Amino acid sequence: MRQCAASTKRRRKTMEASKVYYTDFRCPVGTSLLDKLRRVCIAAGIKDIDMDGKFVAIKMHFGELGNLAFLRPNYAKVVADLCKEQGGLPFLTDCNTLYPGSRKNALEHLTCAQLNGFWPMTTGCQVIIADGLRGTDEAEVPVPNGEYCKTAKIGRAIMDADIFISLTHFKGHESTGFGGTLKNIGMGCGSRAGKMIQHAAGHPEVQQSLCRGCHRCAKECGSDAITYDANNKAVIDQTKCKGCGRCIGACNFDAIYSQCDSANEMLDRKMAEYAAAVCAGRPCFHVSLVQDISPNCDCHGENDAPILPDIGIFASFDPVALDQACADACLNAQPLPNSQLGQNLAKPGWNCHHDNF
């Protein structure tokens, strides 16, 4: 068990480096990795949080169907059991996705979670999809000192919780460089409309070949921006549309989609502000497991070979310091040869700018 002082600092009465606790994955005979997770959480101070009689949201990613890189449910049970020992009422949670797949509404999302092993017998607590059936059950909360987002649209169950814990699989990501704690919180806790605000600078579009003409999207639109053409296909008036994304959640046929046109730099900034909104004003604790470091997000229905060796478990009260510590550890690791990163490094003239992500 090691403690490291991350390079980020928290603003208190006096400035001091944030503490991030770390343990590796080495488990000699008689040593349990699950016990090591428990011990690093305790060392980092999870038992300092008063959980007695309080709802505890444990935010994690249940993995897209077909993906095998997501965190095992056994890890979630360790964290849930720690919460229950302290009198807490934990639940695992995530929000619906903006795009088509196996997690775009609560019913499919719950089925996906169960098929991937997340249900009360394996995790010790219930699973709640935080933004409801269609991804429209949200709370609009202020962003502290927000520059790019003044408010954030967060899954209501997450904001209803008294305590927030993130349990993150740290890996690569095709848009944000890496997917860590801030992404798990910021993007993951956004409702479908919240995800659209982070991803897109514009408005949703209609793929008319998929439109069934059911008119449900028009009923959900608060701006009267949706009409129907001569073929009974939805048309969005971009001059009236406010970009709330409720029509995306209303469509059962994946006919309405976000253009996802925010630049990656802007996406990262919005995501960080959303994470700040989720964490503000209540006790929070964060755990990241740096293992099965796939090059892309667990949102894919597949996962490529890891680009780096398994590194360890990190825990902290500071999500920024936690991401910094995980990223630093990855940048100091030797890339694996039979991987996307290893193959890229072997290409003549390919430049990774000293960054494994």
What is the predicted role of each segment?
Residues 2-14:
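Short, Lys/Arg-enriched N-terminal segments with co-localized hydrophobic residues
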